[in-house]
Amino acid sequence: MAFAETIFEAERTSTAPDRATLRDILRAATSPDHTVLDQSMAGLRLAEPADLVRFLGIHLAARAGIECWLESNALPGWVPPVQTGPIALDLMALGGLPAAFPAPRFDPGAAADWLGVAYMIAGSHLGNRLLLAQAGPALPDYARRFLAGNAMQDYWRRLRSLLAGMPGPDGGESAISGAKATFGHFARCVGMFRLSQSAAA
């Protein structure tokens, strides 16, 4: 199954432009970004321990900077739950943490709205149950904190109340900017991880 359909919520609905919610607009605007990230992760097989460690390492590096930015820029009470802690603990359990590279800084630009960033980071957690099934016995019980966690799914259910509203005066452009910057940040982390793996080979 494609990365965009397992990591991100698969939705095939259409909405009339005059009734499009912010969620509709974000989903349509970031569809190409879904595809790019899907393709960049397509070679990972989570049933293989080495690929599982790579997958978690990419998420640790990408989410660290994003979480730091959201802590300072999201509305009070709307900061997504921290995932870097569970990921790091899982990597330690799998013996993969020493291979992680320093997390790059996340800077979506002054025009970015935190809601677009939160949309991507929360939506990316929705397919974790499917990924957990893909990993199978390769992922021991003591290393399932990230994929089996419920905190981000609970946050997504709350976030949908904001995403269900109509876009603001800018037509959702600031939220789109934030979401696209977040996708781009993840894609760069995938590239950095590949370079680090090639150098170590």
What are these regions (language model features)?
Residues 1-201:
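Metal- and O2-centered redox machinery and metal/ROS homeostasis
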